[in-house]
Amino acid sequence: MTVGSVLSMKAGESQAKDVEKVQIALSQIVMNRREKALNYAVNYASLGYDMAGNLLAQRGILSQMDPEAFHEFYVQLLYVANNLSYWRGDTAKQVRTTIKDFIKKYQKSQRR
């Protein structure tokens, strides 16, 4: 096993943990679907939740995530984040922070 393969495995594990965190955040949006401030965000979050599940399943089967599917997940999160601006409360803050952190991390990884 080379150093590069070990680093690649660790990066994949980190990605999977990030996707899991976001999936939990998306589930919080869906669970709070009755809040008026989440009208559009619920549909976007529901699809994002499914996309996260598919990414995690892919990683379990193939030991890696499809870069194109990962990018599509990122784009979906942009839609979700854009529709959370009027949602208030502690849960809202945690969810927004989790999603924004993921978005920033993805954008930073694409600049390299």
Residue ranges and their predicted role:
Residues Q110-R112:
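Short acidic DE-rich linear segments
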Residues T2-G4:
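Extreme N-terminal basic, low-complexity initiation segments
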Residues A52-F70:
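Amphipathic alpha-helical
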Residues V6, K10-G12, D18-N54:
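N-terminal acidic leader/helix
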Residues H71-K105:
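Amphipathic alpha-helical packing elements
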Residues A37, Q58, Q76-V80:
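A general alpha-helix detector
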